[in-house]
Swiss-Prot record:
Belongs to the bacterial ribosomal protein bL12 family. It holds the Pfam family Ribosomal_L12_N. PANTHER family: 39S RIBOSOMAL PROTEIN L12, LARGE RIBOSOMAL SUBUNIT PROTEIN BL12M. It comes from Leptothrix cholodnii (strain ATCC 51168 / LMG 8142 / SP-6). Disulfide bonds: none annotated. InterPro entries: Ribosomal_bL12, Ribosomal_bL12_C, Ribosomal_bL12_C/ClpS-like, Ribosomal_bL12_oligo, Ribosomal_bL12_oligo_N_sf. This is Large ribosomal subunit protein bL12.
């Protein structure tokens, strides 16, 4: 039986994603290999520096106070502990960081509080 590469490629081209997944699993079992990407040989410290680290510190940025400015000022005061004048100045000067270098859960809670007050805000 002669191997016809073109026929094989045509058959692969007509397969669905599920069929291709099953094919990969069968090849892995048959030949004892893995479809996982291998690390390039000889990649030293330069490759290690290229690894993307998961971000652990987040900033909550107030983009706009919206129509409920008083509610947003109250929320900013609660989140930051600032006085009334400082919180008003922060809100008036948007876009500004409300909280900086905080954990993801804290950033999400602060964002939720600002959004509920009527502000436009985001996490960076």
């Amino acid at each position: 039986m002669a191997f016809d590469k073109d026929a094989f490629l045509t058959a692969l081209d007509s397969m669905t994603v599920l069929e291709l997944n099953d094919l990969v699993k069968a090849i892995e079992e048959k030949f004892g290999v893995s479809a996982a990407a291998m690390a390039a040989p000889g990649a030293g410290a330069g490759a290690a520096a290229a690894v993307v680290e998961e971000k652990t510190e987040f900033n909550v940025v107030l983009l706009d106070a919206g129509a409920q400015k008083v509610s947003v000022i109250k929320a900013v005061r609660e989140l930051t502990g600032l006085g009334l004048k400082e919180a008003k100045d922060l809100v008036d000067g948007a876009p500004k960081n409300v909280k900086e270098g905080i954990a993801k859960a804290d950033a999400e809670a602060a964002l939720k509080k600002l959004l509920e007050a009527g502000a436009k805000a985001e996490i960076k």
